UniProtKB/Swiss-Prot annotation:
Key words of the record: DNA-directed RNA polymerase, Magnesium, Metal-binding, Nucleotidyltransferase, Transcription, Transferase, Zinc
Protein species of origin: Neorickettsia sennetsu (strain ATCC VR-367 / Miyayama)
Keyword flag Zinc-finger: no
Cofactor note: Binds 1 Mg(2+) ion per subunit. Binds 2 Zn(2+) ions per subunit.
Catalytic activity: RNA(n) + a ribonucleoside 5'-triphosphate = RNA(n+1) + diphosphate
Protein name, per record: DNA-directed RNA polymerase subunit beta'
Length: 1375
C-alpha cells in the first residue's frame, strides 16, 4: 500500500490508486510526516514580512515563499533546485510545497483527541467502561482516578478528589498506590488494555446475559474492540503526544491594502496551543507547584480541543470581533466545509451567464448566443485560429485584435463556434434535463435565446430567468455533449418516458384553433380529390379554415377519402409518413398533442419526432397569431342561474343550522355538511358557467377564455370558475376550510369581508413556497446521496424473483392500467396465452408494445416482472432487473447511473409542486369523497365477509369492517369490487341482479357510527359525569351533548371502562351474533345518541365518532408524507397490524390504559396472537370479524417496519410504492415505479443477525447484506453453519450514513462522527460510488468511466493497485 508522500511526489495521477484507507495516526507517524517542529507562535516579521524561523510559517520547515528562491536570497533560479541553503536552511524548490509540507508540535503533556472523547458514542468511554462525565473530570484535572489501589481502601477506577489523594499519600505513602490525573491517566489505562482477552471475555458475557440492556452495551463495546483488533489503530493513539501542523498555504496570512493582515482562524488557534505548550514547558522546568502545572495542562487540553473542534466541549473561543474561530472540524463540515464547498462543488472556468428570451426562429438543437458572451468564452480558440490563419503573428497581437473587436475576429468566431456545442444550465438544476447542449447561433443583443420547446425541461419562463453557458473544451467532451446532452437527444423525460418537448401555451392554442371544425356545417361537404385542390379552393376563398370538407388523402396503401377540415390538412403537411391521419383528424387539445408526439416517436423514431416538434411549433405560433384570440372582459360570462344556486345553498345551510339547533346533528357534522353544500353549489355554478361559454354557433363566435382552457393552453376550469363563476370556499393557513364562501367572482369584484377571507389562501401559498422549496431540495439531496452508487454493472444477475404487478384500482375505477406497470420492464416468468398455450413473452424478455397490447386484450390481470428490489448483483444492479432506460425506451446500458436518475425523478417534482402551490390562490379544493356506491356495470350481487343486520326500514346495516360487494357476470367473472364502510346501509340483497347505475349502498363520510346489534334497553356503565363523559352545553343551540372525555387523567378512575350495554327484558345483557354480549366500549370523543334507559332496535346508532374536519390535501400535506415514508419514520399513531389470518376476539382482562385484542388463527384454533391497543383509540374491527394477515386492527397508518416483518419485502415495496405514488398522482405527476424501487433497494441494504451460526457476528448486529451473503458462501463451502438474518429497513438519511464508503458518508452529514468511526475501524474506501470518486478526483465509474475501469480490470486481472491511506488528526499516513 503506497503512502501519501510518495503518491504526491509521483504526481498523484488518478490511475495510481483504487482505494483510500483512513486510520488513527500514531505519534511516530505524525513525526515521520513532519518537516520540522514548530516551537514559536510567531507568523511573519512585521517589518520584513518574511516568515519567522521555527514559527507557524517557517520557510525552513514548510518550504520557500517564492518558487526556487531561498529566504536569504543566496540561491535563486531553478538551476539550484534541491539545494538547501547553508545560511537560512531553506530548500530551493517550488513554493507549491507550502500546500503539502506539514510540521508538528511536541506537547509537554499528552492531551486527548476531542473527536474520540466527545463524538458520541465516545470511543474512550466505551473502552474504559467509564461515563463521559467521569472521563472529563479526570481529563480536565478535577479528580484523580485510582489505577492501582495497592494497600489503600480505594477501589480500581475510583475517582477521588485532590484532598482525598493528598490524605492517602500522607497516610499510606506515595508508593503504596497509584492514582493519576489528566490525559496521562487515560493514556496509561488505554495502554494497559489487552484487547484480545477483552474480546473473548465480552463474547462469553454476551452469550451468558439475558438482559437486553446489558447485551446492547456489551455488543457496543465488543464491536469497538473488534474494530481496533481488525485495524492498525491502537487505543493509545487517541491520546496525543504530538499534534500535526497544517501546511501554511492551507491556513494563509494575506496582506490587505491598508498594511493590515487577514489570517485564517487556524493560525490563532495554533498560536494559543504553542503559547500554552511553551509556558507549560517552562513551568515544568522551573518545578512550579503541582496546582499551577495542572492548571496549565488543563488549558493546553482546552487549546487543542478548540483547534480540533471549537465549541464542542467548552465555551466557543472567539476572536477580537466576537466571531467564533473556525476550527479544523468546521473547515470540513457543513455546506461551506471542504467536502461540499471545494470537493463536490467546484466552480468551472469558461462560463457565462445572462437573461433568457424566447427564440421561436431557432431549431431545436440551437440556442442564440450573444456575440459578447461568445467572444469571451471562445477566446483561447479565437487566439489559436487567428495565429493559424496568419491573421495575427503572435498571441499578443491576437489578444489586442480581440480586445479591439476587429472585423476579422467575428469571421474567426463564426468558424470557431461552427458545430461546437455549448451547455446551457438553469438553476436550480433539479434533474439532468436542466443541463442541455445546443449549437450556438451568434446574435446581437445581450440576452441568450432559448428554443420554446425546451422550456418545460428547464422549467424556464421568460419573466427574468437567467441561464449559464458552459463550453466543453476537449474533443471527447464535445462528442459527449453532442451524443448525450444535445437537446435533440433528450426528447423523453427519464422520470416517466413521456415526451418532454411537447408544445404548450400559444403553440397549443394555435394547433387547437387550426383543428377546430364549424358546428352544424354543411350536410353534404365539398369533396376534393387531393389536398392541392383544397388549397386552391382556400386561396380563392371558397372554403374557410374550419369548413367541413371531404378530401382524398394519399396513404401508403392508396388514396382514402376523409371528412376533415382545411386546417387539419395544414397539420398533415408536417405529419411524418406512417402516422395515421386519424391521429390529427380531431380537435387537438394539449393531451392529444402530447399523445401525438408520443405516437410519432413510437412510429417514426427519434429524428422524425424532432422535425415534427419543430414543425408543429412553427404552425402553432403562426395560427395563434392569425386566430386573433384575446382575453376580454366580456369573455367572462357570469351564468344567469348563479343566484338560484346560491339561494338554494343558503336554504340548505339554514336547514343544517336548524337541525343543529334541534340537536339532530353535532357541530362537526354541521360544519362538514355546510362545507359540502357550498362545494356542490360552487361546482354547479362552475358547470353552468362552462356550459354557457362552451356553446357556440361558429368558430368565429367561440369564447376566447373557453378556448384557452379547453385546449389546455392556459388556465383551467378552476381558475375560470373564480373569474366568472364564484370563488367558492377558501382555506385558512392551517388547511381548514372557512365555511362562509366567497359568492362574488373576480369579474364582479369582492366585498371587504370577502377580500379579507381570500387573503388567507394567497398568503399561505407564498409562505408555503418559501418553506417547502427548502424541504424538497433537502429531500432530493438525501435521495441522491443514498442512491448515488446504484449503477448498472452486469448483463443479468440470473434472478428469477420479482414483483407481481396489477392494475391500480381506486374506488372501483382503474387509475393505472396493467400496461403502464409493465411498460419498460422485463418479464420474470414465461407469460402464456390461456387461449392457445403459446408464449407471449419469455422469462428475461422485455415487454414491447405488441406483447403489452396482447396481454391487455387477453384480460391477464397480473404479471410477475423482474425488479431492482430482487436483483442479486453484488455492487449495483443488472440490466434485466432494471429494464428499459426511460429516456430512450431501450434496455438500459451498462454503466448507467440509475441511482442518480431515480433520485432526480423522485425529488424534482417535489420541488416543482411546492413552488406551484400558490397558483390557485388558496381556493379550497377539497376531494369530494364517495359516500355511496353505484353499480358501474350490470351484474349479480355477491357479498364477502358479510356481517349484516336489518334495521327499522328493512335495509341491511353493515357491522363488518371488511364487507365488500362484488358484481359478477353469468360466467362468475368479477367486474366490480367495492368496500362498504362500517355502519353503512346496503340497498340490495345477495344474488340480486342489478342494472347499471343502481345505488348499492351508502354511508356517512364524516362520522363513524357505533351500531346496536341487538334490540333492548340502553344502560350506561362506568359513565360518570365530569370523569368519563361531559355534558357539553352548546351555546348556540342550548342542547346538551354527552361526549366521552379522557377518563385516565382523573385520579382513581384509570380502571374505568365507559361503555353502553343493551339489556334484554330480564335485565341481563342482551346477546347478539356469535353469542357475544351487546356491550359497546366508547372511545375518546364519541358523542352519545341515546340516553340511559332509552329503548333501541337493532341497527340504531348508539353513538358517533366525528372524523376530523375536512382539510384540503395538496403536496404540502403530501411532501411530508413522502419524506416520512423515505425516512421510514414511525408514525405518531401507528396502526397495529395482524400477523395471521384469523378471527377477532376481545379479551376479558383489561389493563389500565390498554385493551387486549386476540386474533385466533383460522386453521389452528390454538394459535393466537395478542395485541394491546390504547383504550382511547378507535378499533376498526368488531368481535367475530375475519381479518387477514397484515390488515390493521385500528385506524392510522401501519408501521413500515411491521409490514416488512409480518408481510415481507414484496408487500413493503407494494405499500411504499402505492403510498408515494398516491401523493404524486394527486398532483398529476407521473413517476415510473422503478425509480422508487431503486431508492427502496438502498433502504434495504442492511440485515439484522438472528442466529450467528459459526460466524463471528453477534445476534442483533446490523450488517451489510452483501457482506453477510459473502461470508455465508464461505461458511457453506467449509461445511460450517451459516448465520440467519432478517431484512432491516433504514431511512434514507441513516442508509446514507451507513454506506460502505466513508468518504461519501462524511461528505453527507455528521462529518466528524463518520470520520472518527472510520479511523477506528481502519476502513478502506473502495471508491465504487460517484461522490467518493469526484472527491478523489478520479474518472467516475459510470458511462465511459465504467468501461475504462472494466477494460483496465480485464487487462490487469483483478486489480491490486495502490491504496492511499489517510490518518485522522490532520495527518496523511501510509501503512
Amino acid at each position: 500500500m503506497g503512502d501519501f508522500r510518495s503518491f504526491r511526489q509521483n504526481g498523484g495521477s488518478s490511475v495510481d490508486f483504487d482505494g483510500i484507507k483512513i486510520s488513527l495516526a500514531s505519534a511516530d507517524k505524525i513525526r515521520s510526516l513532519s518537516y520540522g517542529e514548530v516551537t514559536k507562535p510567531e507568523t511573519i516579521n512585521y517589518r520584513t514580512f518574511k516568515p519567522e524561523k521555527n514559527g507557524l510559517f517557517c520557510a525552513k520547515i514548510f518550504g520557500p515563499t517564492k518558487s526556487y528562491e531561498c529566504l536569504c536570497g543566496k540561491y535563486k533560479k531553478i538551476k539550484y533546485s534541491g539545494v538547501i541553503c547553508e545560511r537560512c536552511g531553506v530548500e530551493v524548490t517550488s513554493s507549491r510545497v507550502r500546500r503539502e509540507r506539514m510540521g508538528h508540535i511536541e506537547l509537554a503533556s499528552p492531551v486527548a483527541h476531542i473527536w474520540f472523547l466527545k463524538s458520541l458514542p465516545s470511543k474512550i468511554c466505551i473502552l474504559l467502561d467509564l461515563t463521559l462525565k467521569n472521563v472529563e473530570k479526570v481529563l480536565y484535572f478535577e479528580l484523580y482516578i485510582v489505577i492501582d489501589p495497592g494497600v489503600t481502601t480505594f477501589t480500581k477506577n475510583e475517582l477521588i478528589t485532590d484532598e482525598a489523594y493528598m490524605n492517602a499519600v500522607r497516610e499510606y505513602g506515595p508508593d503504596s498506590f497509584t492514582a493519576m490525573i489528566g490525559a496521562e491517566a487515560i493514556r496509561h489505562m488505554l495502554a494497559s488494555l489487552d484487547l484480545e482477552k477483552m474480546a473473548v471475555k465480552l463474547r462469553s458475557q454476551a452469550a451468558a446475559t439475558n438482559s437486553e440492556v446489558k447485551k446492547k452495551k456489551i455488543i457496543k463495546t465488543l464491536r469497538l474492540v473488534e474494530q481496533f483488533l481488525g485495524s492498525d489503530s491502537r487505543p493509545v493513539d487517541m491520546i496525543l503526544d504530538v499534534i500535526p501542523v497544517m501546511p501554511p498555504d492551507l491556513r494563509p496570512l494575506v496582506m490587505l491594502d491598508g498594511g493590515r493582515f487577514a489570517t485564517s482562524d487556524l493560525n490563532a488557534l495554533y498560536r494559543s496551543v504553542i503559547n500554552r505548550n511553551n509556558r507549560l514547558k517552562s513551568l515544568i522546568y522551573l518545578k512550579a507547584p503541582n496546582i499551577i502545572i495542572n492548571n496549565e495542562r488543563r488549558m493546553l487540553q482546552e487549546a487543542v480541543d478548540a483547534l480540533f473542534d471549537n465549541g464542542r466541549r467548552a465555551k466557543v473561543i472567539k476572536g477580537s470581533n466576537k466571531r467564533p474561530y473556525k476550527s479544523i472540524s468546521d473547515m470540513l463540515k457543513g455546506k461551506q466545509g471542504r467536502f461540499r464547498q471545494n470537493l463536490l462543488g467546484k466552480r468551472v472556468d469558461y462560463s457565462g451567464r445572462s437573461v433568457i428570451v424566447v427564440g421561436p426562429a431557432l431549431e431545436l438543437h440551437q440556442c442564440g448566443l450573444p456575440k459578447k458572451i461568445a467572444l469571451e468564452l471562445f477566446k483561447p480558440f479565437i487566439y489559436s485560429k487567428l495565429e493559424l490563419y496568419g491573421i495575427a503573428p503572435t498571441i499578443k497581437t491576437a489578444r489586442r485584435m480581440v480586445q479591439n473587436e476587429q472585423p476579422e475576429v467575428w469571421d474567426v468566431l463564426a468558424k470557431v463556434i461552427h458545430q461546437h456545442p455549448v451547455f446551457l444550465n438553469r438553476a436550480p438544476t433539479l434533474h439532468r434535463l436542466s443541463v442541455q447542449a445546443f449549437e450556438p447561433v451568434l446574435i446581437e443583443g445581450k440576452a441568450i435565446q432559448l428554443h420554446p420547446l425546451v422550456c418545460t425541461a428547464f422549467n424556464a419562463d421568460f419573466d427574468g430567468d437567467q441561464m449559464s453557458v458552459h463550453v466543453p473544451l476537449s474533443i471527447e467532451a464535445q462528442v459527449e455533449a453532442r451524443l448525450l446532452v444535445m437537446s435533440t437527444n433528450n426528447v423523453l423525460n427519464p422520470a416517466n418516458s413521456r415526451p418532454i418537448i411537447v408544445p404548450s401555451k400559444d403553440i397549443v392554442l394555435g394547433v387547437y384553433y387550426l383543428s377546430l371544425e364549424e358546428k352544424g356545417g354543411v350536410v353534404h361537404p365539398v369533396t376534393f380529390c387531393a389536398t392541392w385542390e383544397a388549397e386552391h379552393a382556400f386561396a380563392n376563398g371558397d372554403i374557410g379554415l374550419h369548413t367541413k370538407i371531404r378530401c382524398g388523402i394519399e396513404l401508403e396503401d392508396g388514396v382514402k377519402v376523409y371528412t376533415t377540415t382545411f386546417g387539419r390538412l395544414q397539420l398533415l403537411k408536417i405529419l411524418p409518413k406512417g402516422v395515421p391521419f386519424e391521429s390529427i383528424n380531431m380537435v387537438l387539445t394539449v393531451r392529444d398533442i402530447s399523445n401525438l408526439v408520443d405516437l410519432v416517436y413510437k412510429t417514426c423514431g427519434h429524428g422524425k419526432t424532432v422535425e415534427f416538434a419543430d414543425g408543429i411549433m412553427e404552425l402553432g405560433f403562426r395560427y395563434a397569431t392569425l386566430s386573433g384570440i384575446s382575453f376580454g372582459k366580456d369573455d367572462m360570462v357570469v351564468p344567469p342561474t348563479k343566484s338560484e344556486h346560491v339561494r338554494r345553498a343558503n336554504e340548505e345551510v339554514k336547514e343544517y343550522e336548524f337541525q343543529y339547533q334541534e340537536g339532530l346533528i353535532t357541530k362537526h357534522e354541521k360544519y362538514n355538511k355546510v362545507v359540502d353544500a357550498w362545494q356542490k353549489c360552487t361546482d354547479l355554478v362552475a358547470k353552468d358557467m362552462m356550459d354557457g361559454i362552451s356553446g357556440y354557433e361558429s368558430v368565429a363566435e367561440m369564447n376566447s377564455i373557453f378556448m384557452m382552457a379547453q385546449s389546455g393552453a392556459r388556465g383551467s376550469a378552476a381558475q375560470i370558475k373564480q373569474l366568472a363563476g364564484m370563488r367558492g370556499l377558501m382555506a385558512k393557513p392551517s388547511g381548514e376550510i372557512i365555511p362562509n364562501p366567497i359568492i362574488s367572482n373576480l369579474r364582479e369584484g369582492q366585498g371587504v369581508l370577502e377580500y379579507f377571507n381570500s387573503t388567507h389562501g394567497a398568503r399561505k401559498g407564498l409562505a408555503d413556497t418559501a418553506l417547502k422549496t427548502a424541504n424538497s431540495g433537502y429531500l432530493t439531496r438525501r435521495l441522491v446521496d443514498v442512491a448515488q452508487d446504484s449503477i448498472i454493472v452486469e448483463e443479468d444477475c440470473g434472478s428469477s424473483n420479482g414483483l407481481v404487478v396489477r392494475a391500480t384500482v381506486e374506488g372501483g375505477v382503474v387509475i393505472i392500467p396493467l400496461s403502464d406497470s409493465i411498460f419498460s420492464r422485463v418479464s420474470a416468468t414465461d407469460i402464456i396465452d390461456p387461449s392457445d398455450g403459446s408464449v407471449i413473452v419469455r422469462a428475461g424478455e422485455m415487454f414491447d408494445d405488441k406483447s403489452i397490447e396482447r396481454i391487455e386484450s387477453l384480460g391477464i390481470d397480473s404479471v410477475r416482472i423482474r425488479s431492482v428490489l430482487t436483483c442479486k448483483s453484488k455492487h449495483g444492479i443488472c440490466r434485466k432487473c432494471y429494464g428499459a432506460d426511460l429516456s430512450n425506451r431501450k434496455l438500459v446500458a451498462l454503466g448507467e447511473a440509475v441511482g442518480v436518475i431515480a433520485a432526480q425523478s423522485v425529488g424534482e417534482p417535489g420541488t416543482q409542486l411546492t413552488m406551484r402551490t400558490f397558483h390557485v390562490g388558496g381556493a379550497a379544493t377539497r376531494r369530494v369523497e364517495n359516500s355511496s356506491m353505484v353499480a358501474f356495470c350490470g351484474g349479480k350481487v355477491k357479498f364477502t365477509n358479510a356481517n349484516l343486520i336489518t334495521d327499522r326500514d328493512g335495509n341491511y346495516v353493515v357491522l363488518s369492517r371488511s364487507f365488500e360487494i362484488l358484481l359478477v357476470d353469468s360466467l362468475g367473472i368479477e367486474h366490480f369490487q367495492g368496500r362498504v364502510q362500517y355502519g353503512g346501509t346496503v340497498y340490495v340483497k345477495e344474488g340480486e341482479v342489478v342494472p347499471i347505475g343502481k345505488k348499492l349502498a351508502d354511508w356517512d363520510l364524516y362520522t363513524v357510527p357505533i351500531v346496536a346489534e341487538a334490540s333492548g334497553t340502553v344502560s350506561y356503565a362506568d359513565m360518570i359525569e365530569g370523569v368519563s363523559y361531559n355534558e357539553v352545553h352548546d351555546e348556540s343551540t342550548g342542547i346538551l351533548n354527552r361526549m366521552v372525555v379522557d377518563w385516565r387523567q382523573a385520579e382513581s378512575s384509570s380502571g374505568l371502562r365507559p361503555r353502553v350495554e343493551i339489556l334484554d327484558e330480564s335485565g341481563s345483557v342482551a346477546k347478539c351474533q356469535y353469542s357475544k354480549d351487546a356491550v359497546y366500549l366508547l372511545p375518546l370523543g364519541a358523542i352519545l345518541n341515546v340516553s340511559n334507559g332509552d329503548v333501541v332496535k337493532a341497527g340504531d346508532v348508539i353513538a358517533k365518532i366525528t372524523k376530523e374536519s375536512t382539510t384540503t390535501r395538496d403536496i404540502t400535506g403530501g411532501l411530508p408524507r413522502v419524506i416520512e415514508l423515505f425516512e421510514a419514520r414511525k408514525a405518531k399513531v401507528n396502526a397495529v397490524i395482524s400477523e395471521i389470518d384469523g378471527y377477532v376476539e376481545f379479551a376479558k382482562d383489561y389493563y389500565k390504559s390498554k385493551r387486549k385484542v386476540i386474533v385466533r388463527s383460522r386453521e389452528d384454533k390454538e394459535r393466537i396472537y395478542e395485541y394491546l391497543v390504547p383504550k382511547g383509540r378507535h378499533l376498526i374491527v368488531s368481535e367475530g370479524d375475519f381479518i387477514r394477515r397484515g390488515e390493521p386492527l385500528m385506524d392510522g397508518d401501519p408501521d413500515l417496519h411491521e409490514i416488512l416483518r409480518v408481510l415481507g419485502l414484496e408487500a413493503l415495496a407494494e405499500y411504499m410504492i402505492s403510498e408515494i405514488q398516491r401523493v404524486y398522482r394527486l398532483q398529476g405527476v407521473k413517476i415510473n415505479n422503478k425509480h422508487i424501487e431503486v431508492i427502496i433497494r438502498k433502504m434495504l441494504q442492511k440485515v439484522e443477525i438472528t442466529d450467528a451460526g459459526d460466524t463471528t457476528f453477534l445476534i442483533g448486529e446490523q450488517i451489510d447484506k452483501s457482506r453477510v451473503e459473502r461470508i455465508n458462501e464461505v461458511m457453506a463451502s467449509q461445511g460450517l453453519r451459516c448465520c440467519s438474518y432478517v431484512p432491516v429497513l433504514l431511512g434514507i438519511t441513516r442508509a446514507s450514513l451507513q454506506t460502505e464508503s466513508f468518504i461519501s458518508a462524511a461528505s453527507f452529514q455528521e462529518t466528524t462522527k463518520v470520520l472518527t468511526e472510520a479511523a477506528v475501524a481502519g476502513k478502506v474506501d473502495r471508491l465504487r460510488g460517484l461522490k467518493e470518486n469526484i472527491i478523489a478526483g478520479r474518472l467516475l465509474p459510470v458511462g465511459a468511466g465504467y468501461f475504462i475501469d472494466k477494460l483496465k480490470r480485464e487487462f490487469t486481472g483483478e486489480r491490486q493497485g495502490k491504496q492511499v491511506s489517510v490518518g485522522v488528526g490532520g495527518d496523511l499516513t501510509s501503512t
